[in-house]
């Protein structure tokens, strides 16, 4: 199998992340030519400067990790990130609204972020582990109609992360209209390979370097 590097969002979203760690993440991403880095909003400007001479996109999160922020706050956070040079946004839906079937509230959040993103790539986290399959499919339909670029499985901060079955379900429901990102618990090449084979177009992980090194040792897996 070819290198997974172009499919990896090299991620650092832990609470105690430092500028030095973000810089190291960016240097690793540039060296291995990952698709992007995914970092906390306050580090966007630093990452943009660090990656200015590379092809690596800079991504950040909005409404992360609980999705509690109002639509207006998510829109404003997105606009600020765009002003600082961000390329990609990973936003979290209002999960309670999704569970209650109040998809109008979910749509409002998503549309607001898409508008503020002004053409930047938008990935929408639906936190699959809390949802019934029928609701996951409904959300894929909503996101595809709204114009989101990706549906993303998880924040990595919930009770569980990406599952092969969810990737297959989302990929099938999307029907090529929207892409799928796997995130949460992808810590090794074998798991990454499973997610890509199941239909993921991106994989979010804080173990990108380890995954590439494992792939180099056993690329045939």
From Swiss-Prot:
CDD domains: DeoC. The active site is at 90 (proton donor/acceptor), 152 (schiff-base intermediate with acetaldehyde), 181 (proton donor/acceptor). Keywords: Cytoplasm, Lyase, Schiff base. This is Deoxyribose-phosphate aldolase. Catalyzes a reversible aldol reaction between acetaldehyde and D-glyceraldehyde 3-phosphate to generate 2-deoxy-D-ribose 5-phosphate. It is found in: Cytoplasm. The keyword Cytoplasm applies. GO terms for biological process: 2-deoxyribose 1-phosphate catabolic process; carbohydrate catabolic process; deoxyribonucleotide catabolic process. It comes from the Bacteria. It comes from Syntrophotalea carbinolica (strain DSM 2380 / NBRC 103641 / GraBd1). Pathway: Carbohydrate degradation; 2-deoxy-D-ribose 1-phosphate degradation; D-glyceraldehyde 3-phosphate and acetaldehyde from 2-deoxy-alpha-D-ribose 1-phosphate: step 2/2. The keyword Lyase applies. Pfam families: DeoC. Its main location: cytoplasm. PANTHER family: DEOXYRIBOSE-PHOSPHATE ALDOLASE (PTHR10889:SF1).
């Amino acid at each position: 199998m070819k290198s997974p590097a172009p499919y990896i969002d090299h991620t650092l979203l832990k609470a105690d992340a430092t500028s030095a760690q973000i810089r190291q993440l960016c240097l690793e991403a540039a060296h291995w030519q990952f698709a992007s880095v995914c970092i906390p909003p306050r580090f966007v400007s630093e990452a943009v400067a660090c990656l200015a001479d590379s092809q690596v996109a800079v991504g950040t999160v909005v409404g992360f990790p609980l999705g509690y922020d109002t639509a207006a706050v998510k829109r404003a956070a997105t606009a600020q990130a765009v002003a600082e040079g961000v390329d990609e946004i990973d936003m979290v839906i209002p999960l309670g609204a999704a569970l209650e079937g109040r998809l109008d509230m979910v749509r409002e959040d998503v549309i607001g972020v898409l508008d503020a993103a002004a053409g930047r790539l938008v990935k929408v986290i639906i936190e699959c582990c809390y949802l019934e399959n029928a609701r996951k499919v409904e959300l894929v339909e909503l996101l595809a109609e709204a114009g989101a670029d990706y549906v993303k499985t998880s924040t990595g901060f919930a009770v569980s992360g990406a599952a092969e079955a969810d990737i297959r379900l989302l990929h099938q429901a999307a029907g090529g209209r929207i892409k799928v990102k796997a995130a949460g618990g992808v810590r090794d090449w074998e798991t990454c390979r499973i997610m890509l084979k199941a239909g993921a177009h991106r994989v979010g992980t804080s173990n990108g370097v380890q995954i590439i090194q494992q792939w180099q040792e056993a690329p045939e897996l």
